[in-house]
Swiss-Prot record:
CDD domains, alphabetized: Anticodon_Ia_Ile_BEm (cd07960), IleRS_core (cd00818)
Subunit record text: Monomer.
Organism: Francisella tularensis subsp. holarctica (strain LVS)
Comment block on domains: IleRS has two distinct active sites: one for aminoacylation and one for editing. The misactivated valine is translocated from the active site to the editing site, which sterically excludes the correctly activated isoleucine. The single editing site contains two valyl binding pockets, one specific for each substrate (Val-AMP or Val-tRNA(Ile)).
Taxonomic classification: Bacteria, Pseudomonadati, Pseudomonadota, Gammaproteobacteria, Thiotrichales
GO molecular-function term, one example from the UniProt record: tRNA binding
Top-level lineage group: Bacteria
Name of the protein in its database record: Isoleucine--tRNA ligase
Amino acid sequence: MSDYKDTLNLPKTSFSMKGNLANKEPMILNKWEKQGIYKKIREHFAGREKFVLHDGPPYANGSIHVGHAVNKILKDIIIKSKTLSGYDAPFTPTWDCHGLPIELQVEKKHGKAGQSISEDDFRKECRKYAKKQVEIQKKDFKRLGVLGDWEQPYLTMNFDYEANMIRTLAKIIENGHLSKGFKPVHWCTDCGSALAEAEVEYADKVSPAIDVKFKIKDKDKLAQAFGLDSLNHDAFAIIWTTTPWTLPANQAIAVNNQLNYSLIKIEDFYIILAENLVEQTLKRYAIENAQIIATTTGNKLTGIIAEHPFYSRHVPILHGDHVTDDSGTGLVHTAPTHGVDDFTLGKEHNLSMEIFVKGNGCYSENTKLFAGEFIFKASDRIIELLGEKKRLMNSDKIKHSYPHCWRHKTPLMFRATPQWFISMEKQGLRDKALQTIKETSWAPSWGQARIEGMVKDRPDWCISRQRTWGVPLPLFIHKETEELHPNTIEILHKVAEKIEKDGIEAWFNADDCEFITETAQYKSVKDTLDVWFDSGSSSMCILDLDKRLSYPADLYLEGSDQHRGWFQTSLLVAMSAKGSQPYKEVFTHGFVVDEHGRKMSKSLGNVTSPQDIYNTLGADILRLWTASTDYKSEMAVSDQILKRTADTYRRLRNTARFLLSNLDGFNPVTDIIEFDKLVKLDQWAIAKTKEFQDKIIEAYDKYQTHTVAQLIHHFCSIEMGSFYLDIIKDRQYTAKTDGHPRKSAQTAIYHIVHALVRWMAPILSFTADEIWDATPKTTDLPIQLCEWYTGLKSFDQDAELDLEYWAKIQEIRSEVNRVLEIKRNEDVIKASLEAEITIYADKYNYKLLEKLGNELRFLLISSKADLKVIEESTSSSIAANILGLLIEITKIEEPKCERCWHRSSTVGDNPQYKDICSRCVENITTEAGESREFA
């Protein structure tokens, strides 16, 4: 037996079988850095139509988690796909750098501002800390393969950004949207500050639920209201509350004019309840022998005076539209400084707005009996006092949804304080925002209804904060009238100029006289701006001012929690400052959870860190998992899920390697064969690739990365791996090196690789770079500067062997493979080349298959394939799952060719080559080698 190894075209490529991504990726990153690849992209696509995806700023605090990674990877995939489509698609990363979380970190090391450390030094430390955190996160984002202008990111603490926030505020004031108000706002006692809606989250809390007796002062008036002559016992209005700590601030009781109220006698006193709540309330009190004396309407009760349960204070009964008879007692305790409805009622009736609770959550010195006590701890003492004074009708516990601080996870309180607001009603901001939402594209589509509901119901936006590390609210108000200085806009622009030069410190360290002359009449506001105003201003501070970008953004892409956060604040700032929408399209992705659908938590031990993933499996595995997951809902990740992703990656890599290894020696300048002259199967491969490319580009355009990933995987494993590449192995390895059959296959492979590497590039950025380096090409451009491949062709409309034809051939081949597997299991054959395949076909299928002539065997990867009419079928033939088709498999008895391994009666016909078939002899000895037309 001779050794024919040197006569075969064995596969050869520099593209390795093993990814070894964790080690290779940093080297590829280093190469990109040296090439200045992002700068080259910008230069190459300069002047093209722009596509701007505006980056929502992550908070500069701590290492990135897998949610951050998902967000940046999705953005990177979209940007890279848009670049492939020929857009100038810049990506400028941003960071949120002010606010409480950074203050808390600095406090741990240096103590509170103004106590252990000066406020000026505290801000310097905050700036230093934020800068360090940005560098940590930047390194991680770059390691994920995310391309962007990392050297010039936008930080909300950049001096120019801080200054432009002040200029944005000036526009908002100029447009009439700012208002000052003494209003109840969500207040965190740990933050010592008001919170915006976006900083409030709801969680279950167990609270005391008590029914309190307010004694009616004028019994005769009450009797008259119920149509009675008189009352011979004390009467009480009963309120139900879950916030006993607000009782010191009670100033009124609210009823509804339209509701019916009952007077009920219990032993030696009367109580007042809403008629529809009598039965369930008495049941709650476990009282059975009560007697309903009379019923009246709420409007008859208004004006009657009650007495505070433990203070010498008169409490009027007033009408409130917010009062219902759905729960409680139908009479509502009213503390104007601790609730929105209470406040509205208090303003309407000029009730006392005395503040009883300080910013730290303790009662102020003017709170009799409870001064200095923490409000939530004082509830038990208040309940005890009510019992002593016989004013407690009932006491219970209730588990209910309650507002908590998003940062501290502690319960909030409503607290009326002087604050600055962007008004939702002045200048019709709410209606304008709602109209703009309708004009914006939202995906998933439910995002529109979600943000509409939030904007429709949201209160005025409280933009003032009582913090140290934040952009100032640099206003001057009159010391007596509290009106804004008449030159406010001019002053703000002066402040912005100083901040642009020296940062926010320029305001905090300045004297008032540097900005105004009337310091005797006006004082400066010491508040800072809500950090959501920082990020919400980004469209004004970045998109509207940076000529490299454009306003509005084409796309915002963030987690689904941003309907109440950045999407909303961006909209409100842009609408109030510029009067137009900041974005054309808004996409959201779901949260990352574990394989059981649980949130990531250190306590559960289910945290998957991006650092662990890219240091072990590689960033491309994380990128592939991100792209493969339908990100419109929750995204499950675990070690097991990532292992499956790594398996998928291996299949994709092996396909790329097989393709590249069969391009050894191929010169695209001299060896390309025209489409019409290719072997028919190679024509199919190119046309099929074109069909997939059209679908893939469409999916990329719709940001459907999971569809892209599915299509690429299907293409590699089914169309290529299970069909085309399986069939052409024989031709590639055994045909004459420079003969037409092999060059035809190499031409198809060349086109396929050039398309496939581009499909992969947005997702598998590192691997695509590696593939590109190993690919024969006619350009020196790096893959990042390429556009979608245009060398693919489709079949003409009148093509006889078109995609539909080959789809039917694939079906038939699958059925043949099924029967081959049956015969393998029966030990009739060990491999398909040992099989003699006979297909019995009806007229329709016969016509399909006869077109392939004697090359049918190459498609079926067998040594012999016969086609016969169905009437000649034998009892040993097996019915296919295709109508009009039977298949018979027998073992071929011909000798094996030692070169191509086909069984052939021609083995030994040539005395010089006794152990190979005549086809192999032709490929070794003749100038042209064998010819192929179909496969």
